[in-house]
Swiss-Prot record:
Name this polypeptide is given: 5-phosphohydroxy-L-lysine phospho-lyase
Subunit (UniProt): Homotetramer.
Family of the protein in this entry: Belongs to the class-III pyridoxal-phosphate-dependent aminotransferase family.
Keyword Transport tagged: no
Cofactor: pyridoxal 5'-phosphate
Signal peptide residue numbers: none
Coiled coil region boundaries: none
GO molecular-function term, one example from the UniProt record: lyase activity
Reactions the enzyme catalyzes: (5R)-5-phosphooxy-L-lysine + H2O = (S)-2-amino-6-oxohexanoate + NH4(+) + phosphate
Highest taxon of the lineage: Eukaryota
EC number: 4.2.3.134
Keyword Lyase: yes
Length: 450
């Protein structure tokens, strides 16, 4: 332990005294004190190494040397706001444009996903002249007041649903109303959006936007059925609204097959607005909104300047460019496909072996493991999931849960997560699940004894 480093207990005591308890820690019963990270590994104050399965912010790996170097070199020369001409912002916008459909060709740079989604909401309202938003159940789009209002995950615990917010069912084919045995779940779930829109219109409401993560994360690592977004976009645009794809958790090659998760819905589907954050800067605060020309021009026509003090700074754009360079140089998109497929295969074997594993779903390095109490009802195994995550931490694997029932193990590791990491993590998962089952059998045996 470094000589100038506080003991863990002192750090915890200071945090409890100085930092609001609403700013929560992972593993609150026994928090991990992380002092260093590299690649897909994190290290505590004692030097113990943890495999990081959840830091999708450290997209190309914690403290990637090329990203660190890019930030350092630019910071030594200039860092200022975007009101001055500078090559970095236009170079970065051009590189991003090469990854997107040509219609998405106007860019705004910001500092966080919340800022990006807030701006997307403003753009949608200016373009359409409408107010209302359709969102998916249990969605989360950010911590600003405007975004809490369109995040059922949050607003149900606060002031409740605003009259201008309309909630459609998650397109969850495992535990939603239209499941894997439905002949056309994409159409069925899209028709639910159509029904929500019609209900709003009957009340005199006008739809500005449909907001959705391209792969709902907080909702439980959901993979929407192919064709769902195209049909939703048709219903929304017919009502005069636009489609906003939130790529903050899932963009930049994480899904492997495509650079953007919305592209899983087919080459003909193009959102009107795309928001980016988290992984875009590999830990540096960067975010972006990409919009079509008509949407951007309507915003410009208001005559109101959009200015963000740090958004699009030379350092932020240098970092963003470095992340794109690493993704390309290290072929991390292909890596996500191969390692993600292998991890899905290993987790699928756990589903066969352990009844608690109800479903394994995912694409690339975005994977969810749905833990259940019984197969017939698919009741979320919430307590078991929490216990499992705690045991994995004791075995130096950092994982967390999500979903309405907090029973979905979510895998969103840095993109350098390896085949060997997959083997290690699943081996530890298997051992803990086996131990849990043996303890249950032991308790049942004791109950059966006279």
């Amino acid at each position: 332990m470094a000589a100038d480093q506080r003991p863990k207990a002192d750090t915890l005591a200071l945090r409890q005294r100085l930092i609001s308890s609403s700013c929560r820690l992972f593993f609150p019963e026994d928090p991990v004190k992380i002092v260093r990270a590299q690649g897909q590994y994190m290290y505590d104050e004692q030097g113990a190494e943890y495999i990081d399965c959840i830091s999708n912010v450290a997209h190309v790996g914690h403290c990637h040397p090329l990203v660190v170097q890019a930030a350092h070199e630019q910071n030594q020369v200039l860092n200022t706001n975007s009101r001055y001409l500078h090559d970095n912002i236009v170079d970065y916008a051009q590189r991003l444009s090469e990854t997107l459909p040509e219609q998405l060709c106007v860019f705004y740079f910001l500092n966080s996903g919340s800022e990006a989604n807030d701006l997307a909401l403003r753009l949608a309202r200016h373009y359409t002249g409408h107010q209302d938003v359709v969102v998916l159940d249990h969605a989360y789009h950010g911590h600003l007041s405007s975004l809490i209002d369109i995040s059922p995950y949050k607003f149900r615990n606060l002031d409740g649903q605003k009259e201008w917010v309309h909630v459609a069912p998650l397109p969850d084919t495992y535990r939603g109303p239209y499941r894997e045995d439905h002949p056309n779940p994409a159409m069925a779930y899209a028709n639910e959006v159509k029904r929500v829109v019609s209900s709003a219109q009957e009340k005199g409401r006008k739809i500005a936007a449909f907001f959705a993560e391209s792969l709902p994360s907080v909702g439980g690592q959901i993979i929407p059925p192919a064709g769902y977004f195209s049909q939703v976009a048709e219903h929304i645009r017919k009502a005069g609204g636009v489609f906003v794809a939130d790529e903050i958790q899932v963009g930049f090659g994480r899904v492997g097959k495509h650079f953007w998760a919305f592209q899983l819905q087919g080459k003909d589907f193009v959102p009107d607005i795309v928001t980016m954050g988290k992984s875009i800067g590999n830990g540096h605060p960067v975010a972006c909104v990409a919009a079509t020309q008509p949407v951007a021009r309507a915003f410009e026509a208001t005559g109101v300047e959009y200015f963000n003090t740090f958004g699009g700074s030379p350092v932020s754009c240098a970092v963003g460019l470095a992340v794109l360079n690493v993704l390309e140089k290290e072929q991390l998109q292909d890596h996500a496909t191969s390692v993600g497929s292998f991890l899905m295969q290993l987790l699928g074997q756990q589903k066969i072996k352990h009844p608690i594993v109800g479903d394994v779903r995912g694409v690339g390095l975005f994977i969810g493991v749905d833990l259940i109490k019984d197969e017939a009802t698919r009741t979320p195994a919430t307590e078991e999931a929490a216990y499992l995550v705690s045991r994995l931490k004791e075995n130096y694997v950092l994982l967390s849960t999500d979903g309405p029932g907090r029973n979905i193990l979510k895998f969103k590791p840095p993109m350098c997560f390896s085949l060997d990491n997959a083997r290690q993590v699943v081996a530890k998962l298997d051992a803990i699940l086996t131990d849990m089952e043996e303890k249950v059998r032991s308790c049942e045996t004791l109950r059966l004894q006279p």
